[in-house]
């Protein structure tokens, strides 16, 4: 029987340090491991039980995201869990199409748009975050991308207050899948 690791990895964690079983990785000196995840995940095959990604995948191009998801599968143990949340493009696009005001306090409470002179400027800011966002997601394409990259049983999940940031709850899609 294969020995299962007790390690869990949070990718794109920013300045956050891991606690308990969690290890953090990002291009930030304050996290546990400083690493560019576009170059792979520096762990052996089948060495992690869980990977958690919060508002990271949208910072990769489509092809970079495919490579990243392949790496996640590689380092997860069989039946390991991949948990993810990404910005929900639908809320911004629906507000735009319906002509609803894109209130900076509602849509950008954590960082006001630097240029919100028109509604489409606010949508563009959300989509590209001054050039740091490379891809937009809705529920359908997030689940499709997980399945297309070989994850089993991709499904939506609820916001988990022990894992997910409360300030991201309104704007996020939450999903999980099995290796």
Regions found by a protein language model. Give the residues of each.
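Conserved alpha-helix/loop element of class I SAM-dependent methyltransferases that forms part
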Residues: 1-5
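S-adenosyl-L-methionine-dependent methyltransferase catalytic module, highlighting the catalytic core
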Residues: 64-71, 77, 81-178
């Amino acid at each position: 029987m294969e020995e299962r690791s007790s390690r869990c990895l949070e990718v794109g964690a920013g300045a956050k340090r891991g606690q308990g079983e969690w290890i953090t990785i990002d291009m930030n000196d304050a996290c546990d491991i400083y690493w560019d995840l576009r170059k792979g995940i520096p762990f052996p095959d089948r060495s992690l039980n869980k990977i958690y990604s919060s508002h990271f995948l949208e910072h990769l191009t489509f092809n970079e995201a495919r490579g990243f998801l392949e790496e996640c599968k590689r380092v997860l143990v069989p039946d390991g869990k991949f948990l993810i949340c990404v910005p929900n493009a639908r809320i911004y696009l629906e507000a735009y199409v319906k002509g609803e005001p894109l209130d900076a306090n509602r849509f950008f409470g954590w960082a006001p748009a630097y240029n919100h002179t028109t509604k489409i400027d606010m949508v563009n800011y959300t989509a590209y975050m001054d050039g740091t966002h490379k891809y937009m997601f809705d529920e359908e394409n997030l689940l499709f991308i997980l399945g297309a990259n070989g994850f089993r049983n991709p499904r939506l999940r609820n916001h988990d207050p022990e894992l997910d940031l409360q300030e991201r709850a309104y704007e996020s899609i939450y999903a999980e899948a099995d290796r």
